[in-house]
């Protein structure tokens, strides 16, 4: 028995010893693999190194070492390899976070802080490879991780991150740039040395405040920089030049032109001393000084400096030509004014088109928005309105309107639309006109206060040598509209403010055709249906044709026979999640090639706004059923798709992109939410807001959020304007939006941001829209009458006018408000 016990103990000791030896071997293998992986990474084989290091980690797992500092180190290194080898940010973050947690558990503070630094550095590295603004979130996260390290303010990397992020934010959130720069200044005070010059930080802060319109703060920080640089030994004269130039810019905005000129002259003298007369720096300083003299009202001095800058081979020829045109206008030298205005226009247009054609479709929008002013795409109303009898300036103004109006829309339509812009001019429009026809382009200067400013109408007849200009007071129109709930036929001030002078200047005769391309508030008023002094509607006396641009006149004359239609109505907005998923999957699975970016998850903040109108619309079912019957009896319509109840999901509409039918009819809730004022938004943000906050409701709009929270991929049931403009509906001749306020939108320099702009950008030829809330029964009668007329062989416009007249002639719907707010847009 004793011998047996001794034998068992000996065997157990052997097993334990063997196990320990085996564990030691495994640990040695893991360490060896780790070392091998590091060497492979250093030789540029990061992906292979990752596989080896994962094998090493598996060995540690088998040794039950998951809660050790060694395991944490391996996790750290695997995370770094995921990033450096595969650019796999998700796996990188997961491994780094686990490594940090393990090191905290092991009370290894110094190594934990090291991992945090590497984690933050990795996020910065990844962010540098990502497009703007996606990269912002990673830079932000890196800063938060740095700030979790006790001594973060002394970290050079933290300083660099703050500086880089402040510069990135300047185009999207200038207040954020200011906050980050102040945080950097504070951090710099805690260390004896920083690779980022504190004067550079102060200079950035000054620039950010200047951009933000806080001129006193901009001046304060610029003075800190300027005084410090002037006292440095040896002085850095180029930086002193730059600080003086900024001081001049700030003083100009503070209306202190004497000091602006003083600092601009100092900057100019330094530019001459450092770079000579034939330099970009000297040319710019001359140009800046000329602008300050012009703002001061010293036109003679402004002309002298502008000429010098213009003759410098490095001068910005476009800006200088534009400034010379302005100066000669003030001096009433019309020949010189027109010469330089035309030169500025031709240079800017050629450069603009060249740059635009080199950009991808998605980048064109940002380019158009950011370069709208610098390339002169807004009409110089100061020149035209000061010399409205100048035929040369009227011609140039018409050309600029043709190019500038709806430019973003043309960009969305592609290269062919852009190339046509190069040769189009007022002569082209005149050649489109027949005898007895008139073209009118309306244009508004867009100030930050949307309700004030000037509207102009440029009127063109076939026989004229140039367009004629008519001034319209925008604020008078707004005041008139504020005094009534909506335009009515008896409200004569609207006729007086809009039509009276135009009719006189255009010498309009009864029955003449008038093509009108509207802008600003006029695009949202049924100006065709306003009564004159004789109580006859303008649209009855003249054949008014509403167009997106007078460039579209040839398209208006084209008559296409419809062959296919798609109808939406009687939609069930509270369709059950099960039915939504069923209907959505039918359309999504039938065309897997549809662009992925057209499908969205319901994660944004506008849900409650767009879903606030959700009542079922029984009249819309009757409407589309009646239209279906009319089209079914037509000899030309070969295919009709009818979507009602739960069938009309958003996917069913998006799937037609690239192969859209001749006619699209949508009877549903329309939503258009746009701020009356810009507030803190710039024009680009305002435009984007309006495009995102306007749309049409489809089946299931009330319940798609339930599905999305379960992780299933369906559309949200709200077809927004910013989605529509991404679709290809170029095969569609007519879209009828039988819903409330589908013709309204936000007034921007880029057009009326909303549904009408979106469908036009998608390539639709003709739209029928509403400018106000619509009555269900009146709309039903209007639409049924329209399609009946259309199938009888009338043109779209004839069918539309006859349908409007049918409402006017009826006892129930003869009131202006029932029929006038429907408009047709070509």
Q: Which ranges hold each PLM region?
A:
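Catalytic cores of enzymes
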Residues: 418-826
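Residue position in alpha-helical solenoids
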Residues: 59-63, 102-109, 145-152, 168, ...
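Helix N-cap/loop-to-helix boundary motif
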Residues: 26-27, 64-72, 89, 107-116, ...
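Alpha-helical solenoid repeat scaffolds used for protein-protein interaction
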Residues: 227, 235, 244, 258, ...
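Conserved alpha-helical positions within TPR/SEL1-like repeat arrays
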Residues: 31-42, 70-84, 116-128, 156-170, ...
């Amino acid at each position: 028995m004793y011998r047996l016990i001794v034998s068992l103990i000996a065997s157990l000791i052997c097993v334990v010893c063997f196990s320990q030896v085996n564990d030691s071997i495994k640990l040695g293998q893991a360490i060896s693999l780790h070392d091998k992986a590091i060497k492979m990474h250093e030789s540029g084989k990061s992906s292979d190194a990752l596989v080896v290091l994962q094998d090493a980690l598996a060995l540690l797992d088998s040794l039950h070492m998951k809660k050790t500092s060694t395991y944490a180190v391996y996790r750290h290194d695997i995370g770094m390899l995921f990033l450096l080898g595969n650019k796999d940010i998700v796996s990188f973050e997961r491994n780094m976070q686990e490594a940090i947690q393990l090191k905290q558990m092991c009370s290894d503070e110094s190594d934990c802080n090291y991992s945090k630094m590497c984690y933050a550095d990795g996020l910065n590295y990844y962010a540098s490879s990502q497009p703007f603004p996606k990269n912002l979130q990673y830079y932000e996260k890196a800063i938060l991780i740095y700030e979790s390290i006790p001594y973060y303010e002394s970290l050079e990397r933290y300083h660099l991150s703050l500086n880089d992020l402040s510069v990135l934010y300047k185009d999207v959130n200038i207040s954020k740039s200011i906050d980050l720069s102040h945080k950097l200044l504070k951090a710099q005070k805690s260390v004896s040395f920083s690779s980022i010059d504190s004067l550079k930080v102060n200079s950035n802060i000054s620039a950010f405040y200047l951009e933000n319109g806080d001129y006193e703060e901009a001046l304060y920080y610029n003075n800190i920089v300027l005084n410090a640089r002037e006292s440095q030994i040896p002085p850095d004269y180029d930086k002193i030049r730059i600080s003086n130039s900024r001081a001049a810019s700030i003083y100009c905005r503070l209306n202190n032109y004497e000091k602006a000129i003083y600092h601009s002259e100092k900057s100019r003298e330094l530019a001459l001393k450092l770079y000579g007369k034939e330099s970009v720096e000297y040319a710019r300083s001359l140009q800046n000084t000329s602008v300050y003299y012009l703002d001061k009202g010293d036109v003679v001095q402004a002309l002298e400096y502008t000429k010098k800058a213009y003759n410098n081979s490095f001068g910005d020829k476009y800006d200088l030509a534009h400034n010379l045109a302005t100066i000669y206008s003030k001096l009433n030298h019309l020949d010189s004014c027109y010469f330089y205005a035309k030169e500025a226009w031709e240079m800017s247009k050629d450069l603009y088109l060249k740059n635009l054609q080199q950009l991808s479709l998605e980048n064109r929008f940002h380019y158009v928005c950011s370069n709208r002013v610098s390339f002169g795409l807004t009409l110089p109303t100061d020149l035209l309105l000061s010399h409205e009898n100048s035929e040369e300036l009227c011609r140039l103004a018409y050309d600029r309107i043709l190019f500038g109006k709806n430019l973003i829309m043309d960009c969305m339509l592609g290269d062919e639309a852009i190339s046509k812009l190069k040769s189009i001019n007022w002569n082209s429009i005149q050649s489109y006109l027949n005898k007895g026809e008139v073209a009118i382009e309306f244009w508004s200067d867009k100030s930050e206060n949307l309700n004030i400013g000037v509207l102009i109408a440029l009127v063109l007849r076939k026989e004229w040598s140039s367009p004629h200009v008519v001034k319209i007071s925008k604020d008078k129109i707004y005041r008139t509209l504020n005094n009534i709930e909506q335009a009515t036929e008896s409200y004569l001030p609207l006729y007086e403010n809009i039509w009276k002078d135009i009719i006189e200047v255009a010498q309009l005769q009864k029955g003449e055709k008038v093509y009108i391309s509207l802008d600003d508030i006029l695009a949202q008023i049924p100006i065709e249906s306003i009564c004159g002094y004789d109580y006859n509607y303008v649209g009855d006396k003249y054949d008014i044709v509403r167009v997106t641009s007078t460039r579209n006149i040839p398209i208006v004359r084209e008559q296409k026979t419809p062959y296919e239609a798609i109808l939406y109505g009687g939609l069930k907005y509270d369709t059950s999640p099960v039915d939504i998923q069923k209907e959505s999957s039918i359309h999504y699975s039938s065309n897997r090639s549809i662009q992925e970016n057209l499908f969205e998850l319901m994660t944004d903040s506008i849900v409650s706004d767009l879903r606030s109108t959700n009542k079922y619309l029984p009249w819309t079912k009757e409407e589309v059923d009646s239209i279906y019957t009319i089209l079914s009896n037509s000899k030309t319509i070969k295919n009709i798709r009818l979507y009602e109840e739960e069938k009309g999901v958003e996917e069913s509409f998006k799937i037609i992109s690239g192969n859209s039918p001749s006619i699209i009819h949508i009877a549903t809730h329309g939503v258009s939410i746009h701020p009356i004022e810009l507030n803190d938004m710039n024009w680009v943000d305002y435009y984007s807001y309006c495009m995102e906050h306007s749309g049409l409701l489809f089946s299931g709009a009330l319940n798609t959020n339930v599905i999305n929270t379960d992780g299933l991929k369906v559309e949200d049931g709200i077809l927004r304007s910013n989605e529509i403009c991404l679709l290809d509906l170029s095969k569609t001749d007519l879209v009828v939006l039988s819903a409330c306020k589908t013709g309204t939108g936000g007034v921007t320099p880029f057009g009326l941001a909303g549904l009408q702009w979106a469908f036009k950008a998608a390539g639709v030829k003709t739209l029928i829209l509403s400018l106000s809330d619509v009555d269900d029964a009146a709309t039903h009668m209007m639409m049924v009458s329209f399609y009946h007329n259309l199938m009888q062989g009338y043109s779209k416009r004839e069918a539309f006018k006859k349908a409007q007249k049918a409402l006017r002639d009826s006892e129930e719907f003869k009131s202006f408000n029932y029929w006038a707010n429907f408009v047709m847009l070509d």
